[in-house]
C-alpha cells in the first residue's frame, strides 16, 4: 500500500510542476494558470515597463506606450471628478521602490462602485503609460473604451476578477 501512496504523491507533484513555468515570477504563473478571466490577457512585464520609464526620464521616449504590469495595491484614493468624468486612482507596487499610479475611468469601467480595489490586493493592469514628468506619470486607459488618440482597450484584474 505504501508504494501506491508514494506513486500518487509523486504523480501529483509532477502534474503541478507542469503547470508552473520554468521562467517568470510567481505572479506570472498565477495569472497564466489560475485566473480564467485573465487567460486571454497579456502577461505582465514589469521589467519592460521599468525600461520604458527610464527611457521617458532620459528623453529617449516621448509618446505614450502600452504597458502590462502587475503588483500589489499599496494605496487607494477616493474617487475624483475630472473634466472627463469620475476616476478611481490607486498605487501599484511593482517591486521594492517601484510604485506607479493607476487611473481608471469609472464611467467606462464595467465594475462595481468604487473602490473595487483594496490595499494588499494583487492586480494586473493593461493600459496606456503616460509620462509628463517625474511627479506626473501613471497608467490610464484601463477600460474597454478607445478613442482616436488611443486605440487599445485596457483592463484591471484584481484578485482574479477582470474589470474593463
Q: Over which residues does each language-model region extend?
A:
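Bacterial N-terminal signal peptides that target proteins for export
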Residues: 1-9
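Bacterial N-terminal signal peptides
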Residues: 10-18
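OB-fold and OB-like single-stranded nucleic-acid-recognition modules
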Residues: 26-164
Amino acid at each position: 500500500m505504501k508504494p501506491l501512496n508514494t506513486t500518487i504523491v509523486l504523480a501529483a507533484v509532477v502534474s503541478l510542476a507542469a503547470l508552473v513555468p520554468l521562467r517568470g515570477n510567481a505572479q506570472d504563473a498565477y495569472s497564466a494558470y489560475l485566473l480564467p478571466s485573465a487567460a486571454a490577457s497579456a502577461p505582465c512585464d514589469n521589467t519592460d515597463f521599468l525600461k520604458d520609464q527610464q527611457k521617458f526620464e532620459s528623453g529617449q521616449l516621448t509618446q505614450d506606450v502600452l504597458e502590462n504590469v502587475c503588483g500589489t495595491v499599496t494605496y487607494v484614493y477616493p474617487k475624483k471628478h475630472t473634466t472627463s468624468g469620475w476616476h478611481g486612482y490607486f498605487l501599484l507596487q511593482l517591486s521594492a521602490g517601484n510604485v506607479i499610479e493607476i487611473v481608471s475611468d469609472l464611467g467606462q469601467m464595467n465594475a462595481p462602485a468604487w473602490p473595487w480595489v483594496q490595499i494588499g490586493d494583487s492586480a494586473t493592469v493593461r493600459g496606456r503609460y503616460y509620462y509628463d514628468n517625474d511627479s506626473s506619470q501613471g497608467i490610464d486607459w484601463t477600460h474597454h473604451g478607445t478613442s482616436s488618440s488611443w486605440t487599445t482597450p485596457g483592463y484591471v484584474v484584481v484578485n482574479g476578477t477582470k474589470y474593463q
